[in-house]
UniProtKB/Swiss-Prot annotation:
(2S)-2-hydroxy-3-oxobutyl phosphate binds at residues 76-77, 119. Catalyzes the formation of 6,7-dimethyl-8-ribityllumazine by condensation of 5-amino-6-(D-ribitylamino)uracil with 3,4-dihydroxy-2-butanone 4-phosphate. This is the penultimate step in the biosynthesis of riboflavin. GO terms for cellular component: riboflavin synthase complex. InterPro entries: LS (IPR034964), LS/RS (IPR002180), LS/RS_sf (IPR036467). Pathway: Cofactor biosynthesis; riboflavin biosynthesis; riboflavin from 2-hydroxy-3-oxobutyl phosphate and 5-amino-6-(D-ribitylamino)uracil: step 1/2. This is 6,7-dimethyl-8-ribityllumazine synthase. GO terms for biological process: riboflavin biosynthetic process. Pfam families: DMRL_synthase. It catalyses: (2S)-2-hydroxy-3-oxobutyl phosphate + 5-amino-6-(D-ribitylamino)uracil = 6,7-dimethyl-8-(1-D-ribityl)lumazine + phosphate + 2 H2O + H(+). It comes from the Archaea. Belongs to the DMRL synthase family.
Length: 154
C-alpha cells in the first residue's frame, strides 16, 4: 500500500460467536499485514443489528471504510434469508449514502455451521481487501481532473 494510510472500522456480529470471533482475528491480522489501521471494532448482537453501528462509523472523519463480519446460518425457517437480504440491502444503502466503502464479510445465507467454519478466513480477508481496494480506487477517482482517454483504475 502506498500513500495515505487507510483507516478501517469493523462491525462484527456476536451471534455465532465461535465463527465471528475467528473472523475478527483473521480480519485484524490481515489488515495489519496490508498496513491498514483498524481504528474501531464494534460488536453488535447480530448481523441484522449492524446498520446503526455502520452508520455511526461512517459519520466519523477518521474512518475511510467499514468491514462487516458475521455468519447467518441456515435454520429451519426462512429467517436466515430475511436477515441476510435486509442487512445486505441496508449496507449498500449506507455505503452510497456516505460515499464510503462498506464491505460484506457476512457468511450465508443458507450456509451450514460446517460451511461457515470453512469460509471464516476467506470471507474475513476478502472483506478487508475489498475495503482497502475500494478506498484506494475511489481516491484515484477523486483525483481525476479531466479525462480525454479511457482511464482504467485498478
Amino acid at each position: 500500500m502506498q500513500g495515505k494510510s487507510i483507516r478501517l472500522g469493523i462491525v462484527v456480529a456476536e451471534f455465532n460467536y465461535d465463527i465471528t470471533q475467528l473472523m475478527l482475528q483473521k480480519a485484524l491480522s490481515h489488515a495489519k499485514f496490508l498496513n491498514a489501521e483498524v481504528k474501531v471494532v464494534i460488536k453488535v448482537p447480530g448481523t441484522f443489528d449492524m446498520p446503526l453501528a455502520i452508520k455511526k462509523l461512517l459519520e466519523k472523519d477518521f474512518i475511510d471504510a467499514v468491514v462487516t463480519l458475521g455468519a447467518v446460518i441456515k435454520g429451519e425457517t426462512k429467517h436466515d434469508e430475511i436477515v441476510a437480504s435486509q442487512t445486505a440491502r441496508k449496507i449498500v444503502d449506507l455505503s452510497t449514502e456516505f460515499n464510503k466503502p462498506v464491505t460484506l464479510g457476512i457468511i450465508g445465507h443458507g450456509a451450514t455451521h460446517e460451511q461457515a467454519v470453512e469460509r471464516i478466513e476467506e470471507y474475513a480477508t476478502r472483506a478487508v481487501e475489498a475495503a482497502i481496494k475500494l478506498v484506494q480506487r475511489t481516491r484515484k477517482i477523486d483525483e481525476l481532473k479531466e479525462v480525454k482517454e479511457t482511464v482504467i483504475i485498478d
